Amino acid sequence: MKRVTVIGAGLAGSEAAWQLAKRGVQVDLYEMRPVKQTPAHHTDQFAELVCSNSLRANQLTNAVGVLKEEMRQLDSLIMKAADLASVPAGGALAVDRHDFAGYVTETLKNHPNVTVHHEELEAIPEGPTIVATGPLTSAALSESLKQFTGEDYLYFFDAAAPILDGDTIDRDKVYLKSRYDKGEAAYLNCPMTEEEFTHFHNELIKAEVVPLKEFEKEIYFEGCMPFEVLASRGPKTLLFGPMKPVGLEDPKTGKRPYAVVQLRQDNSAGTLFNLVGFQTHLKWGEQKRIIRLIPGLENAEIVRYGVMHRNTFVNSPNLLQPTYQTRTRHDLFFAGQMTGVEGYVESAASGLTAGINAARLVNEAEPVAFPKETMMGAMAHYITTTEGKNFQPMNANFGLVPGLVGQTGRMKKPEKYALLAERALEAIKDFTDM
C-alpha cells in the first residue's frame, strides 16, 4: 500500500495531505497539538491562522492573487476553505478563522485515506515523508532536522495583531470604507488629527515591549514588522505605512484625516475586528493603553493580545530542489514557511507542490517542477537557487517571474501584470490533470 507521512497539519501540511489523499495515497498526518502546544497557536484545529485573518489581495493584477488562482486550478483545499469562509475585506480575501480551520480539519479527518495522529514526532521517519512543521517546530524534531541538514536554522521574528470585541468600538467615531472605495466598504476606519497622531506616536515609542532572550537577535521579516519597531523609525514611517490616510476620506467631513487606523472584520458574524498592520510585541497592559488612545477605541476590549514568536527556516538553496525534495534524500520533502516562502498562501502553495510530487514519487512517476512563468514555480525556483548566504524569506511577487518578451517598457503596471497573470494561468493548465 502506498503511504506518505506528513508531519504538521498547518496550511502546508494540510494542503499536502489533501493532494496526496485525493490521488489515492494513504496519508499518516501527524499533528502534535493539542498534546503539545506552540507559543503562537490557540486551538487544536488544522490550518490555524496564527497572525492576520487576511490572505491578502484577490485580484489577478497582484502576484498573490495569481498564486491563489493557480491553486484553485489545482483543486487546493486551502483555497476552497478560504473562499467558503470569506468575510468582507474590500479587494482582499479575508476569512473567518474558525470556519476556515474547521472546514480544513473536518475535510481531512473525514477523508478515508487520511489517518490523523495527535502526537509529536521527535525524529524524521524513514519512508516517503513531507516535513511541514512550520516555523515553530518542536525542539526534539528541530534537533533531528539539524542533524540531517548539518547546519543551524536561520530565523526571524514574526508578530500578530490584537483582536478587538466589535461591541466595544464607538461607532459614532469611526466610519466604514475601503481604500479608494475599492470593492465593498469593508474596513472600520478610526481617523486621527495631527495632534492626536503626535500624542499617539509619542506614547507608542515609550511603551514597554516584552524583552527577547539574551541569545536572540532582533531579526524581523519586513512584511510583518512589529508596529512599535516601525514607529521607532519616525512618525512618517507610520503615516506612509499602516496609518496612511490616502483614499480614506471621512464621509462626515469629506476631508482626508491626518492619519487612519483601519480595523478588519475577523469573523463572519462581524463581532471581532483586528487592527490592520498592528502586529506587536508590546506588553499586554501597554497594548491596552496604546490602543485606547485611538479615536473610537477608548473603551475597546482586547479578546486576543498581539504576540511575537521566533520563526525558523532552513537554508533551502543548499537543501532543496524546486520539487521541494531534499537533494540528498529523494523521498524526503519540506514544505511551508520553514522552506523560506513567506505568507499563508505561499506556505499552502508549497504544500500543494510537495503533495503532488510525493504522490508522483510513490506512484513511480517523475516529480515535477512548475514552470518559472507560474507563481508557484517562480517561488520554488527562488528559494532553491538564491545565493545561500543571502537567503531570506520571500512573498509572492511579480519580480520572481521572467519578464515578458517584447516591448513592455512603456506598459503600465496593471496591463503588464494582467499579461503576466494570463501567461501564468495558461502555463498551469498543463498540470491540472496530474
Swiss-Prot record:
It holds the Pfam family GIDA. It is an enzyme of class 2 (transferase). FAD binds at G8, A9, G10, L11, A12, G13. It is found in: Cytoplasm. GO terms for cellular component: cytosol. The keyword Cytoplasm applies. Its EC number is 2.1.1.74. It catalyses: uridine(54) in tRNA + (6R)-5,10-methylene-5,6,7,8-tetrahydrofolate + NADH + H(+) = 5-methyluridine(54) in tRNA + (6S)-5,6,7,8-tetrahydrofolate + NAD(+); uridine(54) in tRNA + (6R)-5,10-methylene-5,6,7,8-tetrahydrofolate + NADPH + H(+) = 5-methyluridine(54) in tRNA + (6S)-5,6,7,8-tetrahydrofolate + NADP(+). GO terms for molecular function: flavin adenine dinucleotide binding; tRNA (uracil(54)-C5)-methyltransferase activity, 5,10-methylenetetrahydrofolate-dependent. GO terms for biological process: tRNA methylation; tRNA wobble uridine modification. InterPro entries: FAD/NAD-bd_sf, MnmG-rel, MnmG_N, TrmFO. It comes from the Bacteria. Its cofactor is FAD. Gene3D superfamilies: FAD/NAD(P)-binding domain (3.50.50.60). Keywords: Cytoplasm, FAD, Flavoprotein, Methyltransferase, NAD, NADP, Transferase, tRNA processing. HAMAP family: TrmFO (MF_01037). Belongs to the MnmG family. TrmFO subfamily. Catalyzes the folate-dependent formation of 5-methyl-uridine at position 54 (M-5-U54) in all tRNAs. This is Methylenetetrahydrofolate--tRNA-(uracil-5-)-methyltransferase TrmFO. It comes from Exiguobacterium sibiricum (strain DSM 17290 / CCUG 55495 / CIP 109462 / JCM 13490 / 255-15). The lineage of its organism: Bacteria, Bacillati, Bacillota, Bacilli, Bacillales.
